[in-house]
Amino acid sequence: MAFKLGDVIIDRLQFGYGATKTKALYALTQLTNATIDITADSTDIKDKDGNLIYRKYSGKSGEVTATNAFMNLSVIEAISAQDAEIASSSNTIVMPIFKIVKAGETLDITDAVEDSFIVNALSANGSLGKAYTKGSDATATEFKVDTVGHTFTPPTDNEETQYLVKFKKNVKSGAKLTISGDKYPKAHELYFKALAVDKCEIGSYRACIIHISSFMPSPEVSLALQGGDSQTMDYKGAILTNACSTSQDMVEIYFVDEEEEA
């Protein structure tokens, strides 16, 4: 029997997928929702009494808004329009490190950058206290950096219980992403895959795939630096049309009539 168009129920959005023609850019597996809005300009033609006789539509435009449950570094990379720097044992990246060290304890500082240490007392209520300098040994006014044993020893100040230590380190595993004021994201393909249910066949899932051939991400981003359930990250942008193509396709919707695992 030939497939017939009709009502379908979107059960949930599985993921989003960004790519160029030759390279996958990111996968968003924690999308909580996505909305595609297509709007158009219109011109109303009315008679002498103001009655609407005809409405002419032109100039379609599209906007995409999606929400990811967590911060996604691949999306930040796409928005920043710069390749992320990936740290490895052969390509270390100097990164700032912050540690709270309790009095009487030591800190492993393997791969730390020498002479990059800044040490302050840290009170129980979180305020910064006196600053300390580097010395040949830990004293009431100095801290010790052992470059041979790769150990940091905090001051022996009897008035303090903990210290905030900032230093730089050659990191071998991690990434550095940079958002610059003069760089903007490029257009790429965007896909969404959702699981759909036929209203007459509840419990049987089908794949619904949305393809946007030219998606321009917005460089605007909000990074929620907090715990709890408010770590969402919005991802939005515009749908572009190709002025040099005979086809002005904006969005393609594929409904795959084959059963999918939930």
Which residues are covered by each model-predicted region?
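Signature of extracytoplasmic/envelope-associated structural regions
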Residues: 1-262
